[in-house]
Structure formats: C-alpha cells, structure tokens
C-alpha cells in the first residue's frame, strides 16, 4: 500500500487522449475494476472540447481514483498564469497536474507553489518522448535543463516525476533518487514509442513506479490490454 496520490506502489495510468465522451467513458468502464489501475490521465483535447469540469464529473460517475490533468504542456507560460491554472484544476475536481516548466525557474516555482496551495499534486517532467527534443538529440532544449528543472522541483517539495521510458532516462532517475527522499517515477513512451515497462520499473529499484499508457490500451482490447500491463506492473509490487 502506498501513501499519497496513489494507493499502490506500482501501477498503470490509462491516458484518456481520445476525441469523444463515449470513447472516454469506455476506457473508464473497461478499466476501473482492473487491479493496479491507480489513476486516469485527462488530456487537453477532451478538456478543450467538453470542458474540464464536465470531464471530471463524468469520470467520477465511474471511479474514485485520482484524475491527473495533462495540459500538454503546462508550465510554459508566464508565472502569473500559474494561480489561475491551479485554481481551475481544483474547481474542476482534478487531483494532480503534469507540468513541463520549460519557460524557466520563475515559471516553475510559480506553478508548483500554486498547485500545492490548491492541494493539487504537482507532477514534473522535462524530457518529451519524441526525437530531436534535447540539444544532444538535435533539438532546442539544453541537455542539462532537465537536471536543473528536477533539482528546483525537489527544492519546492515535488515527489512525482515524469520520465521517458523510450530514452536514456537512467541518469535522471539516479539524479532524482539521490536528492528526493521518496520519489515516485511516472513513465511515458511505453509500447509503440519503444519504451519497456519492465525495464523502466526495474531501473528505479525500490522506488514507486507507474506507467502512463494511452494508445497501447485504448486502441486495442481495452480491458485485456490494461490487465496485461497490470500483470507486468504487479511483478514489482
């Protein structure tokens, strides 16, 4: 049994990055009773089309599990937006929010602090799963930036971190583990993007580990796919 945001130390988080309410409800109906589903990730597409409060209302007809909002990518605006963002999440019924604070330390601090004030668990990431993101990959974002982002997040009390399972995440996981007393790692990029749940979970040892999984669940037999991923996750319980 885990303490805090999730009720288990290892589990999966279905990503509800779909276009219709029927698709969304089907994910909930098919997975809410699967043993190690620990939360649901709600993306910006559903929120924009139907409103975040409405999405949360529908979700809560099917589940009591935490709802994680992924604004794709929150934390890239000016610091003044943070309070409005956090208040909107709280009033909608969100439990946690993912931010990628690429706009600098002032924005990162503002978003983390605002979320905590509104009793929303901040989940911080900095490396996306696609190619040519960091400068070392031919992208725009400095390769040392994730270390600075995560260090600042830990200083502000963050304990939940997003890492890309389909990239070389191990140095970042080790960096976080040395500085955060009880980190929870949330992996993305598993399945068609090349990441392995088993490798990701085993790489962080005794620490809590979770996998956000979207298309590999909702584009297949939803219940069966969720159960298969849960079988993998429960091996690390």
Q: Model-found features: residue ranges?
A:
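Conserved N-terminal beta1-alpha1 strand-loop-helix module at the mouth
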Residues: 1-68, 76, 152, 219, ...
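Conserved anion-binding
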Residues: 9, 76-169, 181-185
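Hydrophobic faces of well-ordered beta-strands that scaffold small-molecule active sites
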Residues: 10-16, 38-42, 67-71, 97-99, ...
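Short, small-residue-enriched loops and turns at beta-alpha junctions
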Residues: 18-22, 45-49, 73-78, 104-105, ...
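Catalytic cores of alpha/beta
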Residues: 27, 82-88, 173-177, 192-207
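Non-catalytic positions within long, well-ordered alpha-helices that form the structural scaffold/packing
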Residues: 32-33, 89-90, 154, 201-204
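Alpha-helix-loop-beta-strand connector modules within alpha/beta enzyme cores
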Residues: 48, 52-71, 113-127, 174-192
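Glycine-rich phosphate-binding active-site loops on the catalytic face of alpha/beta enzymes
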Residues: 92-104, 190-197, 206-224
């Amino acid at each position: 049994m885990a303490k805090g945001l999730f009720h288990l130390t290892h589990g999966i988080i279905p990503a509800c990055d779909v276009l219709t309410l029927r698709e969304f409800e089907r994910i909930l109906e098919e997975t809410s009773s699967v043993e190690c589903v620990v939360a649901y990730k709600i993306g910006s597409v559903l929120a924009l089309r139907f409103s975040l409060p409405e999405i949360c209302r529908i979700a809560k007809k099917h589940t009591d599990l935490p709802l994680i909002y992924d604004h794709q990518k929150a934390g890239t605006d000016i610091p003044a937006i943070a309070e409005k963002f956090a208040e909107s999440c709280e009033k909608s019924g969100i439990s946690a929010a993912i931010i990628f604070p690429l706009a600098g330390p002032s924005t990162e601090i503002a978003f983390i602090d605002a979320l905590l004030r509104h009793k929303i668990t901040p989940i911080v990431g900095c490396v996306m799963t696609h190619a040519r993101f960091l400068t070392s990959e031919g992208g725009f974002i400095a390769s040392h930036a994730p270390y600075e982002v995560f260090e600042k997040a830990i200083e502000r009390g963050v304990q939940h971190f997003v890492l890309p399972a389909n990239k070389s995440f191990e140095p970042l996981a080790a960096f976080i583990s040395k500085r955060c007393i009880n980190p929870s790692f949330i992996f993305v990029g598993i399945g068609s993007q090349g990441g392995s749940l088993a490798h990701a979970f085993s790489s962080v040892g005794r620490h809590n580990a979770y996998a956000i999984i979207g298309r590999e669940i909702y584009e297949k037999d939803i219940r069966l796919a969720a159960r298969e991923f849960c079988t993998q996750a429960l091996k690390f319980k």
